[in-house]
Amino acid sequence: VMGKTKNTLLTWLKGLPKRWFVDGLSSMALGLFASLLIGTIISQLGQINALSFLSKFGDIAKNKYVVGAAISIAIAYGMHCKPLVVFSCAAVGAFGYDCGGPVGAYIAALFAAEAGNVISGKTRIDILLVPFTTILIGCLIGSFIGSPISQFMTWLGDVINSATKL
């Protein structure tokens, strides 16, 4: 039994780089596109007098909580998580984005999706435990890494701005 567990763990660890960086980042891009980018386009269309009703649609689509949720849901979906994990990631992404922007949502979603997947389908009370675990782990990760990530991204932006002025 120990050998099988060790092999399963090694297989899982070997798959993490593709799962987190290829699948996770490409899915994150889809979530950003489906919310922030499209929301911005809709908002711009709302600047036309005849289409002013679109402004509110765009504003909602590009709201930080909606963008965070879209990022996190897209990541969980791209990682082939079970439905309860995917849907629970909405709260994780909103929280992660609030704490650490898009990178905060990304990292919180990765940990939440993995944690939710570990227990999904293993209990009789999945309907309670899967969302609880997914949201709890994701929000804890988001709260720990959010502020440092936000500070780092601000610093990186300042460095890039300074470099472009040289």
Which residue stretches match the model-derived regions?
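Signature of multi-pass transmembrane helix bundles
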Residues: 2-166
